Curated annotation (Swiss-Prot):
InterPro entries: Cyt_c_oxidase_assmbl_Pet191
Protein name as it appears in the record: Cytochrome c oxidase assembly factor 5
Disulfide cysteine pairs (residue numbers): C30-C57, C41-C47
Motif Cx10C motif location, chain numbering: 30-41
Listed Pfam families: Pet191_N (PF10203)
GO cellular component terms, semicolon-separated: mitochondrion
Keywords assigned: Disulfide bond, Phosphoprotein
GO BP: leukocyte differentiation; mitochondrial cytochrome c oxidase assembly; multicellular organism growth; spleen development; thymus development
Transmembrane feature ranges: none
List of residues that carry Phosphoserine: S37
Protein task: Involved in an early step of the mitochondrial complex IV assembly process.
Source lineage: Eukaryota, Metazoa, Chordata, Craniata, Vertebrata
Domain CHCH: 27-65
Keyword Phosphoprotein: yes
Length: 74
């Protein structure tokens, strides 16, 4: 479930997904229990669904066809 709410100031394109991805990584067992960096945990496969959604959102910013349809994500 997204933790991003509409009353927060907009942090640019895909800001909500970026914030949720960071929160997911910081709350993961990899960071909390094992003490690894969020970057290492992201490479190991934690929060894959948010990582993919963030990638698709960023890609849709550059895609000319998606400019008319709107950005994917929130």
């Amino acid at each position: 479930m997204p933790k991003y709410y509409e009353d927060k100031p907009q942090g640019g394109a895909c800001g909500g997904l970026k914030e949720d991805l960071g929160a997911c990584l910081l709350e993961s067992d990899c960071v909390v229990q094992e003490g690894k960096s969020p970057r290492q945990c992201l490479k190991e496969g934690y929060c894959n669904s948010l990582k993919y959604a963030f990638f698709e959102c960023k890609r849709s910013v550059l895609d000319n066809r998606a400019r008319f349809r709107g950005r994917k994500g929130y």
